[in-house]
Every structure is written in structure tokens, then in C-alpha cells.
Amino acid sequence: MYYSSGNYEAFARPKKPEGVDHKSAYIVGSGLAALTAACYLVRDGQMKGEHVHVFEKEALPGGACDGYKYSIGYVMRGGREMDNHFEVMWDLLHSIPSLETEGASVLDEYYWLNKEDPNFSLCRATVEQGKDAHTDGKFGLSDKGAMEIMKLFFTPDEQLQDKKITDFFDDEVLNSNFWLYWRTMFAFENWHSALEMKLYIKRYIHHIGGLPDFTALRFTRYNQYESIILPMIEYLKGFGVQFHYDTKVTDVKFDIQGSRKMASSVTVEHAGEVSNIDLTENDLLFITNGGCVESCTVGAQDKAAGFDPTIKPGNGWDLWKKIAAQDPSFGHPEKFCSDPELSNWESATITTLDDKIPQYIQKICKRDPFSGHTVTGGIVTVKDSSWLLSWTLNRQQQFRDQPKDQLCVWVYGLFSDKPGDYVKKPMRDCTGKEICMEWLYHIGVPTDQIEELAEHSANTVPVMMPYIDTFFMPRAMGDRPDIVPEGAVNFAFLGQFAETKRDTIFTTEYSMRTGMEAVYTLLNVDRGVPEVWGSTYDVRDLLNATVKLRDGKKITDMDLPLIPRLALKEALKKIEGTDLEKILKEYNAI
């Protein structure tokens, strides 16, 4: 497996890998990484679809990419913010046919939609029950705060092992608009990994200027289950890929001889029956280790979701622990799943049932929420919320079968253990109705109407996810296994807890990249995997981000000590009349 960039490799079709007709594949899980691996097995690996088996412990595919209507109401555990430089994602989705538009791909549909209806927010944050917080597109960083971010940016990864964000940032950053935007957009907490924070800054340096108003983002038409997962499932079914639902993989055994490592058997449980599948070198095993939505609990309008982080037999953490015990190169799951109090948050899907609540939404987002176009344009954060509540409406309807006179609002709170401001209970102890009441309070509904509207004008389903942020926990090299560990003969790891270079976790792209790299490595597919977009090496993006992060202030306006200030003045004299001066002026750096 090797990396590439540019159109030459992107448009090429690889030859059929040698011996692939004699190989089979077993995939543990059916999340985005697993489905991506299956797609690349049949598309570029040209493996027979009937030789590919997907084991999913739930009754439906998709993993964390959900979006369902249950008897208790619509449920979206989360949403995905996409980027124009998700190179692997677009490499695959241009091959996946749309389910709605004949002759178009999922990428075509997505591209047209976001061209015609570009995303941007008109209100990023509120205070005092629905008033605009007037962040006004500013990061609000002092020079000291900007230097703290710069220091982290240039710190080698080796020095960031097991370090927390608070090891680098103090209140100069943590009390700024920058941190408000960042933590609520990406779900970072102060105690999370400084290494991952650095990787995020470098990965999305080209989007720094688009963070305050979300012009950096793109979204699918519907929830990601309907917009991404279902088209992938139909594509795979067309090849004859075998899906095994309600089927747990409870153990994997490895034959390790010196540096050679081979997956030798898989233990599978279905309908109470346990069976073992013996593997040979021609049987490829793709393992989704860990999982951000494991042990999640779902509440209802009149039921709290609760908080139960118990790791049960057959879930992703249990399986990874069994695997990790067999070899040090298989990672250290305990680094991620040992303290769910530091990795949880709770979300809720609020469905409006009449015309009473939408007026308050429209007052804040300044758009008609029933238009079918961009509504909030990303999350609206309640700056003075004890739960640090954020909420969003993507284009409605979010579900194909959603009534046109209803809206689906997604709400989440980073602090599930803190009492609310109106409902004086922790979010995790609140029913759907009570979470809706807290939200209604913060969007400006008069207090004498809140309970009535939460009861009769909305249906709310909460979901608690104990491990949703666990991949952000401080980590060191080796805590996540390589996608294909050194010496591995017939297996690979997939998903957010498999290690790949330079990319950032908690993204659709990361999951899909692990799937592509796993297949290309094990089948030796002779085509380049598109490298992570290299904006961090582009001087134009670096200059633009530097200026935007300081709210448009030039580097000559920095509050520098005398000696550095004189040195900068002398350096600027030396570049007068050069291309360097020209580009610095073009990007308003001087």
C-alpha cells in the first residue's frame, strides 16, 4: 500500500490482484469503516461478492451512522460534518449510485446540493434565552493565546504522548470564542488529547477561517443512514455480499509464530448458537475494534436514557480486550474505555409536532426551517448553558418519510452530569420531555409555556453514549493498533481505533480511510491510496489561517518584546520587492 495525490492515480483502475478469486473476507461490524472495506474489496480488489461476509451484532447496519424511526419517534444519535477534502470518501462515493437520482452517484448528488445550497450560519451562539451572543465571527484570541496554539502546532508528536489539552492551553485559549467554537463543533473537552488537538489543527488548517460561521462545512440531504449507509448497502448487495445481522463476533484467535501473525479462528454467536470459523491465509479478517456508540442507552419522551457504561460480552470493547491480550501490537483498549465519565455526552432528537415551536427556531437562525434549504447551518451553541447545550437543524426533512409539517432538531450536551438551568437535573437523568424543556428555555420560549410545548408540541428521544468521545482520550504511540500490524498475514483493524498517519478521528473520512488502507494492504491493490489533504504544507493556507485566527490582525501588529520586534522589522526590510513580500501582502499578513 502506498499513498498518492493528484488525478493520475485517482482516475486509474487497478488490475485484478493476484489470487483474489481464491480468497474470502470476513468483516466484523457494519459501520462506515467496515462497509468501506467491503466496497473496496469488490470494486478495486475485484473479490467475488459472495465471498465477502459482514457480521453485524445489531439488526441494522451502519454503526454510529444511524437515523431511524422507532415506535418512540425519530432518532439520530449524531450527525456528520463533511469536508471538501475527504479524499477517500469521495474516491468511493463517486462509484456508489444514488438511490434517488437515476444516473447519478452519491457524490454527484451531494456536490450539486452543496453547490446550490451552500452552508453558513447566521447565529453561532446564544445567551440569555435565545439572544444572539454576538460572537460576530471573531475568535477573540489574545496574542498569548495565539502563541499557545502555535506552540502546540509545532510540537513534535513524540512529545505529545499522553498529554492533555490543558498541558498546553490556559484561560487565554479556554475562555476564548475559539475554544467555544472548537469544543462544541468537534466535541473536545479540556482534558482530551493534546496530540489529537494538534492533528485537528493541522488537518483542517485550510478551514480555520470558516469555523466561526461554518462556511467550512457541507452536509448530506438526509441523515447519514439514508444518505450514505443505505446506498452503500444496495451497492454491496448488487455484488452479492453476504450480510449476517444479529450476529456477534465474540472472540478472535491468532496463531503467532515469531514475527508472523495470522488470524486462525473467529467465534460467532447467532440466535443463541455459537460456532467457530477456521481461517486460512486466504481468509481475510477485518476487525472493527472498540466502538464509540457501544453501551449506548435510548430513552423516550417520558423515560431518561440513563447511564450504563457496562462493557458486555460481544461488544466492540470486549472483543478488542480479548484480542489485545494476545499481542502487544494489537493496542491497549484500556487507555480509551476505562473512564466513561470523561468520554460521554448525551444527545436527543426533538421532533416538533405543530407550529408553536418553529417560530422560536426561525427567530434565532433567521431562516424558514420548512424551506428544505439550510436552516441553522451547523450547531447553535447556548453559551450560558450548564450542559453546554448545542442544537442544529439540517435541511428538512431529515428523514424521507418525515411529515412536511414536522421538524427534526438534534440537540447535544457536553456536560451530562451537571444540573440544568431550567430543569434542575443532570441531563443523563432527564426524560426526553425534560430535555426538550431545557432546550425550549434556552431558545426563548416563555417559561409559562415551556412544559405545555414540551408535552404536546414535541416528541423527544434522548440517547446516552458513554464512549462517544473515548477516542479523544490522551494516548501514546501503540495504544491504537496499526491498520495492518507488522507481521500480519490475513487481518486488519478498522475504524476510529486503528492507527493511520496524519488523519483525524471522529470523522467519516477517518473510518473510510482505514477501510481502504486495510483492503489495499492485504490484497496488494496496485493503486495509490489518496493521501491526507496537505494544506498544512501549503504556505497560502498557513498564512490565511494565521491571519484569520488573529481576527484579521497583521503579524506586524503583534505585541512583541523589543528584540523580536526589531528582528521582524529588519526581516521585512530584506524582503521588500520580493515574491515573499507579495504573498504576505496578498494574505494580509503585513
Label the predicted regions:
Residues 37-50, 235-241:
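A short, Lys/Arg-enriched amphipathic alpha-helix followed by its capping loop at the start of a domain
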Residues 72-112:
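Conserved FAD-binding subdomain of flavin-dependent enzymes
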Residues 42-69:
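Glycine-rich FAD pyrophosphate-binding loop
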Residues 205-220, 282-284, 289-514, 520-537:
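C-terminal segments that line or cap access tunnels to active or ligand-binding sites in enzymes
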Residues 1-25, 43-51, 545, 549-590:
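Extreme N-terminal leader/targeting segments of oxidoreductases
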Residues 29-32:
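Glycine-rich Rossmann-fold phosphate-binding loop(s) that bind the pyrophosphate
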Residues 202-284, 288-290, 302-303, 308-317:
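Helical element adjacent to the flavin cofactor pocket in flavoenzyme catalytic cores
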Residues 99-206, 217-219:
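Rossmann-like flavin
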